[in-house]
């Protein structure tokens, strides 16, 4: 979207804070239904980020695939779980939680260090050269492929990591029963 600078910044800050709050809701809420709805909220807000960056196809694909299919599937799976069994086996803190929190915190700090050490000028220069290549492409599918592998590579990979974590969590929940 072509918005004015301050409006664009306000939307980015509100979407970012909503994603952070929704992510905290996914992790911290003890009711799995609330956690699944919070996950849907996060995925909708991520698709709004794609709309702000003028990638309407990726936003529509994310809404249809991740929110419309996968999140609804997660909600159905949670609704079919026996809630009383889940809460009887619920422990507030385990050794595995401590280990995974240490691992996740170290990954967070390594990502922060990587982001601070990255030369963003080279990345911007690379995407501008890809805009020249885009004019020669005839097919929309080729343009989508170029954009997914250059401009939207990071959001595409982050979404795939979120999906992988959801899949591992679903397998862990299925094994527990």
Swiss-Prot record:
Keyword list (alphabetical) reads: Chloroplast, Membrane, NAD, NADP, Plastid, Plastoquinone, Quinone, Thylakoid, Translocase, Transmembrane, Transmembrane helix, Transport
List the Gene3D superfamilies hit by this protein, alphabetically.
Answer: NADH-ubiquinone/plastoquinone oxidoreductase chain 6, subunit NuoJ
Q: Does the keyword Transport apply?
A: yes
Task: Give the CC-aspect GO terms.
Answer: chloroplast thylakoid membrane
Query: Which reaction is recorded as catalysed by this protein?
Result: a plastoquinone + NADH + (n+1) H(+)(in) = a plastoquinol + NAD(+) + n H(+)(out); a plastoquinone + NADPH + (n+1) H(+)(in) = a plastoquinol + NADP(+) + n H(+)(out)
- Which cell locations does it reside in? Plastid, Chloroplast thylakoid membrane
Quote the InterPro entries the UniProt record gives: NAD(P)H-Q_Oxidoreduct_6, NADH_UbQ/plastoQ_OxRdtase_su6, Nuo/plastoQ_OxRdtase_6_NuoJ
Q: Which domain of life is it from?
A: Eukaryota
Q: Per the UniProt record, which EC number(s) apply here?
A: 7.1.1.-
Report the family membership.
Answer: Belongs to the complex I subunit 6 family.
What the protein does comes down to:
NDH shuttles electrons from NAD(P)H:plastoquinone, via FMN and iron-sulfur (Fe-S) centers, to quinones in the photosynthetic chain and possibly in a chloroplast respiratory chain. The immediate electron acceptor for the enzyme in this species is believed to be plastoquinone. Couples the redox reaction to proton translocation, and thus conserves the redox energy in a proton gradient.
Name the chain's protein.
NAD(P)H-quinone oxidoreductase subunit 6, chloroplastic
